[in-house]
């Protein structure tokens, strides 16, 4: 409407206003929701849980799983409620004994220097926190006051023990150690020993080792059974291998973990075109081991979607020997280079080995035959002008 009146030029009219409502509208395919995020968090929302009381049966685990603000709020309210509760008890004891009556009393009070609820509240804090100012004290006049003193001390010790244990468990949780276990941002598929392999790189930034480290991998995809049952998250275990074979790894330096795509692999019919079309595929990698310093089992997780798998790439070397020891350049941790790789599935490669022979023949031509050019006649491929240096 504004463009018709000449207020907004015609070329600045929004596309949404200019499109024909009778024409069908197309939109890009939405990206598949992750089952496990890149940082290892499970992308699952639990809804309509009826038996909420099950969480209260394990109060300690519930407190540890809560976020820090909620945990601190619960402990703060626990201290305040216990102080107020016992302050009311001390005030009632003083009121029943007549210690709150005005005037100089000839009888010995149950608790000295308690004249109001405020003084009873201060005495409750002094008893539970064991401050010991010395202005108020329990006398031998009331046995009930002695019993309440013992009960409040026990309650205070229990709250302190639970709070310290919860804080210790939250600060020493296993996932804190997993923050320094890193995975490559992309996974690659390339030839290794004449077979197509799915490869990724894993590393540990700390010097303290992960003992008995093992790595597992699962493929998660949406499948339909022959009976018509739709399984939205069908999980299939696939074997992972390293340089020494098996799932156990010695994670001192970054390692390239690979999976040989053979006839038993769920990636046997996966080709480069499937990756480009964002196939409904997610590969979850789980690294698990025991922390050397604490003895706690830790687990690091990540996942790779179809568009995060690079076909025909290989990781660059990052470990070098310098001054009698090995050094790791983490700036190249996720860097890859293109390598000759058949543009077919592992199934097609097993059926037609000529694809691999043709690829090997093509890769041996050209780069190995290097023309020798005399140094004196060699021409520079580029030159640096004085303007470029300024």
Swiss-Prot record:
Keyword Transport carried by entry: yes
Entry GO MF terms: ankyrin binding; ATP binding; ATP-activated inward rectifier potassium channel activity; metal ion binding; transmembrane transporter binding; voltage-gated monoatomic ion channel activity involved in regulation of presynaptic membrane potential
Segments passing through the bilayer: 66-92, 143-171
Coarse class of the protein's main subcellular location: membrane
Swiss-Prot/TrEMBL keywords: ATP-binding, Disulfide bond, Ion channel, Ion transport, Membrane, Metal-binding, Nucleotide-binding, Phosphoprotein, Potassium, Potassium transport, Transmembrane, Transmembrane helix, Transport, Voltage-gated channel
Disulfide bridge positions per record: 110-142
Descriptive protein name: ATP-sensitive inward rectifier potassium channel 11
Organism the protein comes from: Cavia porcellus
Lineage: Eukaryota, Metazoa, Chordata, Craniata, Vertebrata
Gene: KCNJ11
